[in-house]
Amino acid sequence: MATTNNKNLTITEKVYVRVRLANEADISHIYKLFYQIHEYHNYTHLYKATESSLCDLLFKANPNPLFYGPSVLLLEVSPTPFENTKKDEKFKPVLKTFDLRATVEDKEAEEFKSKSCGDEKEDVFIAGYAFFYANYSCFYDKAGIYFESLYFRESYRKLGMGGLLFGTVASIAANNGFASVEGIVAVWNKKSYDFYVNMGVEIFDEFRYGKLVGDALQKYADKEKV
């Protein structure tokens, strides 16, 4: 059951979910979701992307084979069932139904209404994303997948959807010959930490994440090439 009022969406009992590969028509939503995750981590001052630069990164300037370049999976929700008729040569959408433990109140529904459904449904909304790309390591003789981030809008957290989205990326890796799925886990976020452990991720506490960026990186620039 669902109701809409003043651009808000209320869903009770069941929500229908689709995971699909993002495309250029989704760029405005991806930009907003990327901003929201920076907001969640108090890093908005570091968010330098624009819709145009993201589009170039993810689509126009991404000549890599599927899933080797920057890739985004979107998780869409709807109060009515999806039909299993969407034909996508690159990636077959994953469909699932969730029984809700609590009512979903989405005050951003109109802002995140999907523009790229590939069908005639008018009640499809983007709830979250997974961002990943291929990486390489001397430990393996094949590429792995670097899982950069997983994010859900506030209305769709704690509903069990994270497992579907992460599991879809893991299935992509397993089915396409990638050696691993790896990424960074925030040790301060116990729920996130426990989530990845429960998904089968092995945490290596003896390693620390390092980054060379900004002025520290520019010190290495060759002035003669500027």
Swiss-Prot record:
Provide the primary localization. Answer: cytoplasm
Site, Important for catalytic activity: residue positions: R157, G160, G162
* Domain spans labelled N-acetyltransferase: 72-222
Specify where the region named Important in binding site and for catalytic activity lies, as residue ranges. 29-45
Identify the Pfam families for this entry: Acetyltransf_1
Keywords of this entry: Acyltransferase, Cytoplasm, Transferase
A molecular function (GO) held by this record is: tyramine N-feruloyltransferase activity
GO cellular component terms attached to this protein's record: cytoplasm
| EC identifiers of the protein | 2.3.1.110
- Keyword Acyltransferase listed: yes
Q: How is its activity regulated?
A: Inhibited by (2-hydroxyphenyl)amino sulfinyl acetic acid 1,1-dimethylethyl ester, by DEPC and by N-ethylmaleimide.
Subcellular location field: Cytoplasm
Gene3D superfamilies recorded for this chain? 3.40.630.30
Q: Which reaction does it catalyse?
A: tyramine + (E)-feruloyl-CoA = N-[(E)-feruloyl]tyramine + CoA + H(+)
Question: Record's PROSITE patterns?
Answer: GNAT (PS51186)
State the source organism's domain of life.
Eukaryota
Give the similarity note.
Belongs to the acetyltransferase family.
So what does this one do?
Answer: Synthesizes amides which are involved in stress response in the cell wall. Catalyzes the synthesis of hydroxycinnamic acid amides from hydroxycinnamoyl-CoA thioesters and various hydroxyphenylethylamines such as 4-coumaroyl-CoA and sinapoyl-CoA.
- Mind telling me which PANTHER family this protein's record contains? DIAMINE N-ACETYLTRANSFERASE, TYRAMINE N-FERULOYLTRANSFERASE 4_11
Subunit-level organization: Homodimer.
Its recorded name reads: Tyramine N-feruloyltransferase 10/30
Q: What is the protein's species of origin?
A: Nicotiana tabacum
Which gene name does the record give?
THT10
